[in-house]
Every structure is written in C-alpha cells, then in structure tokens.
C-alpha cells in the first residue's frame, strides 16, 4: 500500500497536485516514488538503470506519459536515491526484482488505476529486470505490457565488448577493487564506490565511448545536482554476468524493445535477439548509441512508446478504444 510522503514538482510546469512523492514497502525498507495521477485507468511503472535515480532516468518520459492520460509510478530501487536500504549505492539484482514486484503491487492499489492495465517501463538494467519479470508465469506478476528501452539483455555478451574499451592497467586493478569491496560487504562495511561512467583509463563501471553521453542525456545543465552517479564496486560483476534476455521466449505479454543500433554499452544484438524470441515482441530500432532515446531520437521513441501503450492498455479485446469510449 502506498503512503504519501509529500507533494512536489521537479519538472517545469508540473504542479504538486499532478505529482506527489509516495513510498511503498519492499522487504524491510521503503522505496520512494513519484506518483503522477492519470485519467485513463492505465499506469506505467518506471525505473532507471544501474545507479540511475528516478528523476534523471524517468522524468522526461513520465511527463509525456502523464500528459497522455496515464498514471505513472516512477521509483528508486532500494539502496539508491531516496529509497531506503543500507549500504548505499549497492545493486542487488534479486532485491531489485522484488522492488519491481512491490512497485507493481503499489500501482495496482492506486485508486485511479485498473489493476489489469499496468505496464512496466525500464531503461538499461531496469529494462533487463522487466525481461526477467515478464517471463514468469501468469499470476506471478502484474504486467500487462513491457517497454524495454536500451535493455541490458545479456551481460555476458556485452561486458567483454565493453571491457575492450578499457586500458590494461584498469583491467588488472578493477577486479582487485571489486573483490576488496565484496570483502567489505561481508564484514558489514561501507562500499567502495566507483563512477557509473568515465573516459578510457578511468576506474569506472563503464568507459565505453557512449557512456560519456550519460550526463548530457540524463543530467543536462546539472539539472539533478543530488544524483551522485556512483555504484558500489562489488555490484559491477553481478551486473556484468546478468542474462535476463535468455528467458525471453517465455514472455507472453506485449513487449516493445527500443534498440539503439550503435549501442556500445549493452549492445544492440542481445536486445534484438530477446525481442525476436518473445512471442508478442515488437522492435523499434533507432539510430544512435545507448542514450539515443534521451537525445536525438527522443520524439521518435516517445511517439512509438505512446502508440504501444495505447494499443495494449487502452483497447479492449474487441479492439475498441476505451479512452475514446470513456
């Protein structure tokens, strides 16, 4: 059940009445979310990638979905952003999947939302989580549709390519830092953090050429000064080995995969493969790298995502437009 913590804007032109900060329980901690109250009965639950908080990761897309009538629940995973959980900056895949389950349950409890009209929207790592979650049998999730934007579909394929952009010195030192941080975790000590992205030669999670676009795409003009853009070193290896696209053939619900053709961070091929294996998979390919949907291809992607949501959340089985009938 959602608890209102306060109202607030944060997006130009958006009033506190249109967006309020709420919290929902996941495990023993609270996840903090923005709730945009919609008018058409459908809801989009949203989250960003590894270490990407809800504001830079979802604000621009959430505002467009809300303007089209959708409710939105955009949340921070535990240990990240405004959500609870200690230690900070740690990504635990099983916990983040549980956060998604709790977020979907929260969305279903919102008074204006019809529980059968809930879609998930994820970017990068969060998109991978949705591939994994949607592959579960009916009754084990609340998803009616999924948008996977630049999905991390197969870390075992994309990570070796990403490592090719690193220097030998970093390749030798980073595993030692990650192991040291893992040992700190076992001892209950605070994590050693590294930047989410950096130039070649930096001790960062990603040093692919397109990783440098992240700040420009998600945080233009330092719009979100509180976003720390770091991750625990102990979290990098589990993400690198994460392969959520392998179960895509079990996804029976509508899936839209938004694939950047020149993506150097998660690669295009694994996401394409996953979407093609999904029985109800749809693919939008756009020119550009990992952050294309936030940059030059933004309007194209928003239009395609709204069309997908409209077709799969606002039409009944007879094909009638429920929004028009309301």
What spans do the regions from the language model cover?
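Conserved alpha/beta-hydrolase
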Residues: 64-84
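Alpha/beta-hydrolase-fold enzymes
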Residues: 131-217
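N-terminal cap/lid segment of alpha/beta-hydrolase-fold proteins
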Residues: 2-38
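Alpha/beta-hydrolase active-site loop
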Residues: 90-111
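Catalytic histidine-centered segment of alpha/beta-hydrolase-like enzymes
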Residues: 288-302
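The serine-hydrolase catalytic nucleophile loop
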Residues: 50-63, 77, 269
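Conserved alpha/beta-hydrolase "acid-adjacent" motif
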Residues: 264-270
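Short beta-strand/loop motif that positions the catalytic acidic residue
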Residues: 251, 257-259
């Amino acid at each position: 059940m959602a608890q209102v913590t306060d109202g607030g804007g944060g997006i130009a032109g958006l009033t506190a009445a249109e967006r309020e900060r709420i919290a929902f329980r996941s495990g023993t901690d609270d996840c903090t979310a923005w709730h945009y109250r919609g008018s058409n009965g459908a809801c989009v639950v949203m989250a960003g990638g590894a270490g990407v908080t809800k504001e830079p990761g979802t604000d621009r897309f959430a505002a467009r979905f809300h303007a089209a009538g959708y409710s939105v629940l955009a949340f921070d995973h535990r240990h990240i952003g405004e959500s609870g959980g200690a230690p900070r900056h740690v990504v635990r895949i099983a916990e983040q999947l549980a956060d998604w389950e709790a977020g979907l349950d929260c969305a279903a409890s919102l008074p204006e939302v019809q529980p059968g009209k809930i879609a998930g929207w994820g970017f990068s790592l969060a998109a991978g989580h949705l591939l994994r979650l949607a592959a579960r049998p009916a009754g084990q999730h609340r998803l009616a549709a999924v948008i996977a934007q630049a999905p991390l579909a197969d870390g075992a394929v994309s990570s070796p390519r990403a490592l090719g952009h690193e220097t030998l010195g970093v390749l030798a030192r980073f595993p030692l830092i990650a192991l040291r941080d893992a040992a700190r975790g076992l001892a209950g000590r605070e994590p050693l953090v590294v930047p989410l992205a950096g130039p070649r030669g930096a001790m960062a999670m990603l040093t692919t050429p397109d990783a440098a676009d992240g700040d420009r795409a998600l945080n233009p003009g330092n719009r979100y000064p509180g976003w720390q853009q770091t991750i625990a070193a102990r979290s990098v290896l589990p993400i690198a080995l994460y392969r959520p696209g392998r179960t895509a053939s079990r996804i029976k619900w509508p899936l839209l995969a938004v694939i950047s053709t020149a993506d150097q961070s998660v690669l295009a091929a694994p996401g394409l493969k996953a979407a093609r294996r999904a029985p109800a998979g749809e693919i939008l390919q756009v020119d550009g790298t990992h952050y294309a949907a936030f940059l030059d291809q933004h309007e194209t992607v928003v239009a395609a995502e709204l069309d997908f949501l409209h077709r799969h959340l606002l039409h009944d089985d007879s094909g009638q437009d429920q929004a028009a009938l309301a």
